[in-house]
């Protein structure tokens, strides 16, 4: 779908209606409007027709590929209108006379037309399209009806203060949009490409792999790369949520979007912009703000019935009592108009999505990226979490602690052939074996002789070196190839090695539990998580040791498909949504099948693609943070829903009793919207 910017979009209800209208068009396959970022995502066969349709139905809106500069909002016309209105009312009450009354009536009529210009035009546009329950149409009906029953001052005051409230609402929405827009504006928009001795300004999207870019102090690294010259400090908080600057020097890996704080750096490009870390952050935040939560979908549906229902109630209040001789029509029409004033669901339509987007924003600033706002809802319902072990609960920094040769082979041979087989693997265990080989053997001739490499998920690898077949993996791997072997010790992770179908020994590898793992599980329990489980492809002894330390159940020696099956059983046992946290390629199926899959940031690309949430800083404490954000977001959203509906219900009752006046009822509409909007902004500070 193509992305467009919508200019002058300041009404959430109008945005929802426009989205529905666009999706009814024959030449539009799909249209989606993101009110919080003022963007239209459109799949159409005729863009010009879409532009013409929008121009005809919403003349004040316009589309463009690029975002226009924001026009400052001026308070002057609003203040002048209010001053004229209050001055006219004051003169009328201080110097009452027939001439003054006529003059003030003319002034009030002009104030009504000036302050209500947008409402009147919007009402006629809506009525022309058959939208009789449009907010503008209802406001026009209410004020004209107030004129008809002799409430001239109140009729004008409604329009003036309603327009003032709408202006403040637009101002508040603009500020909230600016806060949300900041989340997707972390990407650099310029790069300095080095060509010989000159620097050329280019867009990050135009950079190619192996290009050399210069990053000056105070500027952002344009794409992922490696430092080839210079030493500096980088602020990576936009990516990881960590405020502590990171030291970088030659050969240090750097991430696109990092802010250079200290000295000039020369960086060699390793990834295209679309594949770099910052592009993925922007895409995830954009994707999350485009999606609607179940609560938002309910509110959207609810709002379509709410306005007609309140209008019907207002009509009944205005008509029925006089028919039963309970008062005059003028009296009950006035009371009905009070109820009519609270017929707009804007407080809900605006505050609910902004609340969720604020939660997404708060999470992203802490290095927690979500792929949809629905995740926030599910997180508040879960009571169970399952973890992968290696790299998730443990540091994933493996070290070879012992080499045990068998059948007449030496330690050097076992390590050499194991490293040979693992050369093309990026698994942490493989990297530890390669590192040990480099340190012990100082030999890398075998690097050029590897072919027919194959990784068997959850078991190990096999590869051919010259004409020799090397197999390295767990006991399941040996059983698969019918290789006889002797028992291995129960402590640590074991990599068995076979050469040409002959067992030659095993390597013992150790891993450490993460420093914050115990504290994380304790804090998760305090957040209401009751059930914990470790699902690991590692052997039983290594998994059991970690599980005993953390005090949770475990399942070991699992293949990827077995891990998914066991997780499903774990979830069904507690009959509630469950979370899975993992980081490896073999975790991808389970992450995809979980109600909420959480991928650790240093894990494989496949695991991050399968996850609903990506924790960029790789810290387990972020699990506690994201649950707290989800709960606070849900609490604030339901505060808004109950507050808005409660206040509106109160004004309907007060209108029925004849206690509330029309201008007071304006607070029940615009005032409640402003308060709900302000409350929603608290989610950004979650």
Swiss-Prot record:
Residues bound to Zn(2+): 11, 14
Residues that coordinate or bind Mg(2+): 583, 587
Mapped to this chain, the residue ranges on the Extracellular side of the membrane are 93-102, 152-154, 328-332, 658-665
Gene3D superfamilies xrefs:
3.30.70.100, Calcium-transporting ATPase, cytoplasmic domain N, Calcium-transporting ATPase, cytoplasmic transduction domain A, HAD superfamily/HAD-like
Name the catalytic site residues. 388
Q: How does it sit in the membrane?
A: Multi-pass membrane protein
The record lists the membrane-crossing segments as: 73-92, 103-124, 132-151, 155-174, 309-327, 333-350, 636-657, 666-681
EC numbers, comma separated: 7.2.2.12, 7.2.2.21
**Which GO CC terms are listed, alphabetically?**
plasma membrane
Q: Where in the cell is it found?
A: Cell membrane
Give disulfide pairs as residue numbers.
Answer: none
Matching entries from SUPFAM superfamilies are given as: Calcium ATPase, transduction domain A (SSF81653), Calcium ATPase, transmembrane domain M (SSF81665), HAD-like (SSF56784), HMA, heavy metal-associated domain (SSF55008)
Molecular function (GO) terms for this protein are: ATP binding; ATP hydrolysis activity; metal ion binding; P-type cadmium transporter activity; P-type zinc transporter activity
Highest taxon of the lineage: Bacteria
Q: Name one Pfam family in it.
A: Hydrolase
- Class of this enzyme: translocase
Q: Which residues are noted in the entry as Co(2+)-binding?
A: 11, 14
Q: InterPro entries, alphabetically?
A: ATPase_P-typ_cyto_dom_N, ATPase_P-typ_P_site, ATPase_P-typ_TM_dom_sf, ATPase_P-typ_transduc_dom_A_sf, Cation_Transport_ATPase_IB, HAD-like_sf, HAD_sf, Heavy-metal-associated_CS
* Membrane side Cytoplasmic: residue ranges: 1-72, 125-131, 175-308, 351-635, 682-686
Please indicate if the UniProt record lists Secreted as a keyword.
no
* Positions of Cd(2+) binding: 11, 14
- Protein keywords: ATP-binding, Cadmium, Cell membrane, Cobalt, Magnesium, Membrane, Metal-binding, Nucleotide-binding, Phosphoprotein, Translocase, Transmembrane, Transmembrane helix, Zinc
Q: Which reaction does it catalyse?
A: Zn(2+)(in) + ATP + H2O = Zn(2+)(out) + ADP + phosphate + H(+); Cd(2+)(in) + ATP + H2O = Cd(2+)(out) + ADP + phosphate + H(+)
Give the function comment from the record.
Answer: Couples the hydrolysis of ATP with the transport of cadmium, zinc and cobalt out of the cell.
UniProt record similarity statement: Belongs to the cation transport ATPase (P-type) (TC 3.A.3) family. Type IB subfamily.
What protein am I looking at?
A: Cadmium, zinc and cobalt-transporting ATPase
| Native species | Helicobacter pylori (strain J99 / ATCC 700824)
């Amino acid at each position: 779908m193509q992305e467009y910017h919508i200019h002058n979009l300041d009404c959430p209800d109008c945005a929802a209606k426009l989205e529905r209208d666009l999706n009814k068009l024959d030449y539009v396959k799909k249209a989606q409007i993101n009110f919080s970022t003022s963007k239209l995502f459109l799949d159409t066969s005729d863009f010009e027709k879409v532009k013409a349709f929008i121009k005809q139905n919403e003349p004040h809106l316009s589309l463009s590929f690029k975002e226009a500069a924001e026009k400052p909002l001026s308070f002057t016309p609003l203040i002048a209108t209010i001053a004229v209105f209050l001055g006219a009312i004051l003169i009328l009450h201080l110097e009452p006379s027939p001439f003054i009354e006529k003059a003030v009536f003319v002034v009030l009529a002009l104030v009504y037309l000036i302050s209500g210009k947008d409402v009147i035009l919007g009402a006629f546009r809506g009525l022309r399209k058959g939208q009789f329950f449009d907010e503008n149409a209802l406001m026009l009906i209410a004020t004209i009806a107030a004129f008809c029953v002799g409430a001239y001052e109140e009729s004008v005051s409604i329009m003036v203060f309603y327009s003032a409230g709408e202006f403040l609402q637009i101002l508040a929405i603009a500020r909230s949009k600016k806060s949300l827009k900041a989340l997707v504006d972390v990407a650099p928009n310029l790069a300095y490409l080095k060509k010989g001795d000159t620097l050329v300004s280019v867009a990050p999207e135009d950079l190619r792999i192996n290009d050399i870019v210069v990053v000056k102090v105070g500027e952002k690294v344009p794409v992922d790369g490696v430092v080839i010259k210079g030493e500096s400090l980088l602020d990576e908080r936009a990516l990881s949520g960590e405020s502590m600057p990171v030291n970088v020097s030659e050969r240090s890996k750097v991430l696109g979007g990092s802010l250079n704080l200290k000295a000039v750096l020369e960086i060699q490009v390793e990834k295209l912009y679309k594949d770099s870390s910052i592009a993925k952050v922007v895409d995830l935040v954009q994707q999350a703000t485009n999606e609607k939560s179940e609560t938002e979908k309910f509110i959207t549906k609810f709002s379509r019935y709410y306005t007609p229902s309140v209008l019907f109630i207002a009509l009944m209040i205005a008509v029925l009592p006089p028919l039963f001789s309970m008062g005059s029509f003028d009296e009950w029409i006035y009371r009905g108009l009070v109820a009519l004033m609270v017929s707009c669901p804007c407080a809900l339509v605006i505050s609910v999505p902004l609340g969720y987007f604020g939660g997404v924003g708060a999470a992203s600033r802490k290095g927690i990226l979500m792929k949809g706002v629905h995740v926030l809802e599910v997180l508040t319902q879960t009571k169970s979490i399952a973890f992968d072990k290696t790299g998730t609960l443990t540091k994933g920094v493996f070290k070879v602690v012992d080499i045990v040769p068998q059948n007449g082979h030496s330690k050097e041979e076992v390590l050499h052939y194991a490293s040979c087989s693992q050369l093309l693997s990026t698994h942490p265990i493989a990297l530890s074996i390669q590192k040990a080989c480099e340190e012990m053997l100082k030999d890398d001739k075998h690097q050029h002789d590897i072919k027919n490499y194959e990784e068997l998920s959850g078991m190990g690898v096999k590869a051919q070196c010259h004409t020799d077949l090397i197999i390295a993996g767990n006991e399941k791997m040996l059983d698969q190839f019918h290789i006889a072997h002797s028992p291995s010790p129960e402590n640590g992770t074991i990599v068995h090695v076979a050469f040409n179908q002959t067992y030659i020994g095993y390597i013992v590898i150790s891993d450490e539990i993460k420093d914050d793992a115990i504290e994380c599980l304790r804090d998760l329990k305090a957040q209401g998580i009751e059930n914990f489980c470790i699902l690991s492809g590692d052997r039983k002894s290594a998994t059991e040791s970690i599980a005993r330390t953390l005090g949770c159940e475990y399942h070991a020696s699992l293949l990827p498909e077995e891990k998914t099956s066991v997780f499903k059983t774990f979830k069904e046992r507690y009959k509630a949504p469950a979370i899975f946290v993992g980081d490896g390629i073999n975790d991808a199926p389970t992450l995809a099948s979980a109600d909420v899959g959480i991928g650790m940031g240093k894990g494989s690309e496949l695991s991050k693609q399968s996850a609903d949430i990506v924790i960029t800083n790789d810290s387990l404490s972020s699990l506690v943070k994201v649950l707290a954000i989800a709960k606070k977001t849900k609490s604030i959203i339901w505060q808004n829903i109950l507050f808005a509906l409660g206040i509106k219900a109160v004004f309907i009752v007060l209108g029925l009793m004849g206690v509330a006046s029309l201008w007071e009822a304006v607070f029940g509409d615009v005032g409640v919207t402003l308060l709900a909007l302000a409350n929603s902004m608290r989610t950004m500070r979650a």
